[in-house]
């Protein structure tokens, strides 16, 4: 998994297990998770719809999506993945699409689900308000709301990236 991650450009990620629970040196960054999210959306569109479902029935049992609250609260939200461990906190990689714009955001280390969802809402709102269609990946600017975050504007997307490679345990 780590080799594949590196090949995708996830330079600061090391996978130590497939389930994502805390393990020594099992780490990633918001930037790397955004790269993974983008690859998931665009490289595997036939599977991406699975991440936007509120629930699924498997063998007569209903399994609920862990990000269904965010999906139902944010206009255009269509995925992707939540996570939590004691060491990593509450995390979310999310994507939303409005018209021709798709914004991907990643929040690591929140102290609660509600704070995580609030931060993600703020990030996606900033993305939709500030991104332009067909802009090359060259424009960097600081966000005063999150001084340790930069944004990279790109064609139909806004990638939120930590200025420093803050590594956190994966969940």
Model-predicted segments: where are they?
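Beta-lactam-recognizing serine transpeptidase/beta-lactamase-like catalytic domain environment
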Residues: 1-11
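Short, conserved loop-to-beta-strand elements that form functional interface hotspots
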Residues: 18
């Amino acid at each position: 998994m780590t080799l594949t991650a590196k090949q995708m450009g996830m330079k600061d990620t090391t996978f130590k297990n497939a389930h994502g629970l805390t393990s020594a040196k099992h780490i990633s960054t918001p930037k790397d998770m955004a790269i993974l999210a983008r690859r998931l959306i665009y490289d595997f569109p036939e599977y991406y719809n699975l991440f936007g479902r509120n629930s699924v029935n498997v063998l007569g049992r209903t399994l609920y999506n862990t990000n269904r609250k965010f999906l139902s609260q944010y206009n255009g939200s269509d995925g992707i993945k939540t996570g939590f461990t004691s060491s990593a906190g509450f995390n979310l990689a999310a994507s939303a699409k409005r018209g021709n714009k798709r914004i991907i955001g990643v929040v690591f280390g929140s102290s609660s689900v509600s704070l995580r969802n609030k931060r993600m809402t703020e990030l996606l709102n900033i993305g939709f308000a500030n991104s332009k269609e067909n802009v090359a990946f060259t424009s960097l600017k600081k966000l005063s709301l999150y001084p340790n975050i930069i944004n990279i504007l790109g064609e139909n997307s806004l990638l939120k990236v930590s200025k420093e490679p803050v590594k956190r345990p994966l969940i």
